[in-house]
């Protein structure tokens, strides 16, 4: 199978490495100097230092149309902010297309309260609905995938051809790929878990204990499910890899950038300091406001996400954000909106 991966960050490189032993894979970097450095060193020093790239993996820059010529699967491994441009550039492509990003697009008009960012499948529907497209998501740190550690992901698309292509491309000895046609649920899980991970990082940074962490994860899953149901997702999707699975990993894993933001805020760092120290994107910081804004518009209650936004905006201190949750009136345990 011939695969072209757009984007030589950690995740794009990790999947390219994973598939290169079984398929003909081209890893395309936007920056020519980066591509040359990776190809020469056979290592992505910036994103996956110490990991040798397999000899069969081709790394290139330059003409993207030429790089993906004849590809049977195109994988877009760019941040959410670049997805719209990438999908527009892929108009006319007949091969299946899949993106890897999780979160929401930055609002097109940040000054307008009525403007909010879109999930990836909504961008797809706006700019290139003719593409056969979908998402590869689930609980995964790029470093572990690149090292060949056991991982399970979900390929989500309304098109069976896209799901089948992703399974064929990446399912192997260490990486299991499950198929799901609920792209809305898979993407909601991938976006909301980043917001909730900031909350669990805050919990851990304040040393509130494992009971508190478990409560946040469980009630956070309820918020995620309510939000997803209101957008048309299926409830069972949130008990799968892209829901519960990704939430547990991102909320507890030491490699989680979103959890790290919460930890740093709990230690007294400003948001700007926390983000600057990461060196990479923490999508939860950028999608939290959109999640809350859309939830309000749908009449969905998301108190944990609301607390995270108040914390990020500086309206609540870490301690006040916790108090805003623990001081709530008792309610029945419920997942439904």
Swiss-Prot record:
Active-site residue list: 193 (proton acceptor)
Chain positions recorded as sn-glycerol 3-phosphate binding sites: 102, 138, 140, 193, 246, 256-258
Chief place of localization: cytoplasm
Pfam family, one: NAD_Gly3P_dh_C
Catalysis performed (reactions): sn-glycerol 3-phosphate + NAD(+) = dihydroxyacetone phosphate + NADH + H(+); sn-glycerol 3-phosphate + NADP(+) = dihydroxyacetone phosphate + NADPH + H(+)
Keywords, in A-Z order: Cytoplasm, Lipid biosynthesis, Lipid metabolism, NAD, NADP, Nucleotide-binding, Oxidoreductase, Phospholipid biosynthesis, Phospholipid metabolism
Biological process annotations from GO: carbohydrate metabolic process; glycerol-3-phosphate biosynthetic process; glycerol-3-phosphate catabolic process; glycerophospholipid metabolic process; phospholipid biosynthetic process
GO molecular function: glycerol-3-phosphate dehydrogenase [NAD(P)+] activity; NAD binding
Compartment(s) where it occurs, according to its Swiss-Prot or TrEMBL record: Cytoplasm
Entry EC number(s): 1.1.1.94
Domain of life assignment: Bacteria
Entry binding sites for NADPH: 11, 30, 102, 142, 257, 281, 283
One cellular component (GO) term of this entry: cytosol
Alphabetical list of InterPro entries matching this protein: 6-PGluconate_DH-like_C_sf, 6PGD_dom2, G3P_DH_NAD-dep, G3P_DH_NAD-dep_C, G3P_DH_NAD-dep_N, NAD(P)-bd_dom_sf
UniProt-listed Gene3D superfamilies: N-(1-d-carboxylethyl)-l-norvaline Dehydrogenase, domain 2, NAD(P)-binding Rossmann-like Domain
Protein's pathway: Membrane lipid metabolism; glycerophospholipid metabolism
Task of the protein: Catalyzes the reduction of the glycolytic intermediate dihydroxyacetone phosphate (DHAP) to sn-glycerol 3-phosphate (G3P), the key precursor for phospholipid synthesis.
Family as reported in the entry's similarity comment: Belongs to the NAD-dependent glycerol-3-phosphate dehydrogenase family.
NCBIfam families linked: PRK00094.1-2, PRK00094.1-4
Name of the protein: Glycerol-3-phosphate dehydrogenase [NAD(P)+]
